[in-house]
């Protein structure tokens, strides 16, 4: 059956059905089903979240000052960003302000997360969708060295270094214990890199394992631990004592100097490894511009990284805010989190129930009541689904919409909005990438563009960290050591009933928490996370979400090896892990693969 969606996609589910399940992430597990035509081109895509989060239910009647500690556990990869969003929601509801030092420290922690998440995502979750590890065994180490030195002056680029990496890789392969490289689609026709580029990428994959351990030390310095650092309504929980005396764990100059050193390291890694690798890989995939989906149509960002404490206006935010509709870069619409006409969640195709499912609810009025049922055209059972019925309920993810539109969120959305706003810090790097690769601006709206935007954002975040670190040190030297305001800490100072919203730009996209507080306790709590936007099912009018849209019209080299599906889905950074099964239309396993 062929369907034309309101947001401009033609769906045809009459072809062969391919099921990828489970594709897992921290918020839950993900399943993808596609229909391909006789030429193995994807003509229909169905994305579903197969696990109920339920944090909103857990939080009801709890102390709002503790909400951050619960919501932070939603995700163990983008650790801390839910906590920051939560404390901002409570502060917004109760009118609590934070000191300047707390604003700088929060920005440092959030930006450190951006860099950490982007680096780990690309090298350890996404790179192997572009890089053929086995091909690296046939590379010439001297030619690999020449390639590496032609794109960067990174010191680990000698022929001997790459020879050692190749030898280690060969022993690894010959041992039969492939670990993260097991069951890859090595040799698939969709791999385009020469052996030398593959060897260089494998070397940097290994280097990034060590590098990511250093970045998280910033969270342990300011937040006490990682993952899940500590946060505080009204500021940050770390006192400042530059003379080294006082509370255990207080921030002193030794620890501040360590943060400065880590920032210098991550800037160098971004400049000399991550961004050059993206450019090198991109140069071989210039003709693989699939996966754009909604990115060239509808994108959305809340904005984040406030310059000034307690100022979340668009002018204060370093990351851009706004919405673009129908691909019109000439107009960026303002975004208001509190406007019930702007943001609504639908459950027509989600395993929840509303009193009237033809209408969406603003998160302040949101309902999280599970209602698990399979549609009449589904195959299998509730505990063993063989094929979903996308005409009915088919996902544990709700369908958020901005003024009725399905939207893409994430680094690409942020950079498209910054580009459209003609902000030099976003537009100039994008223009340079496009010019160096010889690509038009429309190439930005693709899987490759989404991957490049994440690298550019990691680079941008490193320099912003240096800025806020210098700002923090200057403020401390000026005599300001405040890190928290606690004048409204006690519940007896709060209104009887109040509501608020907190927002951030998580590494994977716009994130917001809406809270209602009544009699000092949480009366209602709703989270709308990046994957809710990108992984949303269809809405009452038939609009498809960003994941589903991105897979449309993508050709597959081999349907039993869904490399192209994973390449595009991974580009959104849905924290994939565990194993994936590919099923034939009759439910029989065709192949088993390990997603890395």
Swiss-Prot record:
TM segment ranges: none
Main localization (coarse): membrane
Protein family (similarity comment): Belongs to the [NiFe]/[NiFeSe] hydrogenase large subunit family.
Protein's recorded name: Uptake hydrogenase large subunit
Subunit composition and interactions: Heterodimer of a large and a small subunit.
GO molecular function: ferredoxin hydrogenase activity; hydrogenase (acceptor) activity; nickel cation binding
Sorted UniProt keywords: Cell membrane, Membrane, Metal-binding, Nickel, Oxidoreductase
Cofactor(s) required for function per UniProt: Ni(2+)
Co-factor binding details: Binds 1 nickel ion per subunit.
GO CC field: plasma membrane
Recorded superkingdom: Bacteria
PROSITE patterns cross-referenced by the UniProt entry: NI_HGENASE_L_1 (PS00507), NI_HGENASE_L_2 (PS00508)
One Pfam family hit: NiFeSe_Hases
Location of the protein in the cell: Cell membrane
Enzyme class (EC, first level): oxidoreductase
Amino-acid positions noted as binding Ni(2+) in the UniProt annotation, renumbered to this chain: 75, 78, 575, 578
Catalytic activity, as annotated: H2 + A = AH2
Mode of membrane association: Peripheral membrane protein
EC number(s) per entry: 1.12.99.6
Purpose: This enzyme recycles the H(2) produced by nitrogenase to increase the production of ATP and to protect nitrogenase against inhibition or damage by O(2) under carbon- or phosphate-limited conditions.
């Amino acid at each position: 059956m062929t369907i034309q969606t309101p947001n401009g996609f033609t769906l045809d589910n009459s072809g062969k059905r391919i099921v990828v399940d489970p594709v897992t992430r921290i918020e839950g597990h993900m399943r993808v089903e596609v229909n391909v035509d006789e030429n193995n081109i994807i003509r229909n895509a169905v994305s579903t979240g197969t696990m109920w989060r339920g944090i909103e239910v857990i939080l009801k009647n709890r102390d709002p000052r503790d909400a951050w500690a619960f919501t932070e556990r939603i995700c163990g990869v983008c650790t801390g960003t839910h906590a920051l969003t939560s404390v901002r929601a409570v502060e917004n509801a109760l009118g609590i302000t934070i000191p300047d030092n707390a604003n700088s420290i929060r920005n440092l922690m959030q930006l450190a997360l951006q860099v950490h998440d982007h680096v780990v995502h690309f090298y350890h979750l996404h790179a192997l969708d572009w890089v053929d590890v086995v091909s690296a065994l046939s590379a010439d180490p001297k030619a690999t060295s020449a390639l590496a030195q032609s794109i960067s002056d990174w010191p680990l680029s000698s022929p001997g270094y790459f020879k050692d990496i190749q030898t280690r890789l060969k022993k690894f392969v010959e041992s039969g214990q492939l670990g993260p490289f097991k069951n890859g689609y090595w040799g698939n026709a969709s791999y385009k890199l020469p052996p030398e580029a593959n060897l260089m990428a494998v070397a940097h994959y290994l280097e990034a394992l060590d590098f990511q351990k250093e970045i998280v030390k910033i969270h342990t310095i300011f937040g006490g631990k990682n993952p899940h650092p500590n946060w505080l309504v009204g500021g940050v929980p770390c006192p400042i004592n530059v003379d080294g005396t006082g509370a255990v764990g207080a921030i002193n100059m030794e620890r501040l100097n360590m943060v400065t050193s880590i920032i210098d390291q991550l800037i160098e890694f971004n400049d000399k490894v991550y961004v050059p690798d993206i450019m090198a890989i991109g140069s071989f995939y210039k003709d693989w511009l699939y996966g754009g989906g909604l990115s060239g149509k509808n994108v959305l960002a809340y904005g984040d990284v406030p310059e000034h404490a307690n100022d979340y206006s668009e002018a204060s935010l370093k990351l851009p805010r706004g919405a673009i509709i129908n691909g019109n870069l000439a107009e960026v619409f303002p975004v208001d989190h509190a406007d019930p006409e702007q943001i609504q969640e639908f459950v027509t195709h989600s395993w929840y129930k509303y009193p009237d499912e033809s209408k969406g609810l603003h998160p302040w009025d949101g309902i999280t009541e599970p209602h698990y049922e399979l549609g009449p055209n589904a195959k299998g059972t509730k505990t063993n689904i063989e094929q979903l019925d996308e005409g009915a309920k088919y996902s544990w993810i709700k369908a958020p919409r901005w003024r009725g539109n399905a939207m893409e969120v994430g680094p690409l959305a942020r950079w498209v909005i910054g580009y459209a706003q003609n902000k030099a810090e976003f537009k100039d790097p994008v223009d340079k990438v496009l010019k160096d690769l010889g690509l038009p601006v429309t190439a930005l709206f693709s899987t490759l563009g989404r991957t490049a935007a994440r690298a550019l954002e990691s680079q941008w975040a490193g320099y912003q960290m240096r800025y806020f670190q210098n700002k923090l040190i200057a403020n401390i030297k000026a005599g300001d050591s405040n890190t928290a305001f606690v004048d409204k800490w006690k519940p007896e100072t709060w209104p009887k009933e109040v509501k608020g919203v907190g927002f951030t730009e998580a590494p994977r996209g716009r994130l917001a928490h809406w809270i209602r507080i009544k009699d000092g306790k949480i009366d209602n709590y709703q989270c709308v996370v990046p994957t809710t936007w990108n992984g949303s099912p269809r809405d009452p009018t038939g609009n498809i979400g960003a994941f589903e849209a991105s897979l449309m019209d993508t050709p597959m080299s081999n349907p039993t090896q869904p490399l192209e599906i994973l390449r595009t889905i991974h580009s959104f950074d849905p924290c994939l892990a565990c194993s994936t099964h590919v099923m034939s239309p009759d439910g029989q396993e065709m192949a088993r693969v390990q997603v890395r």
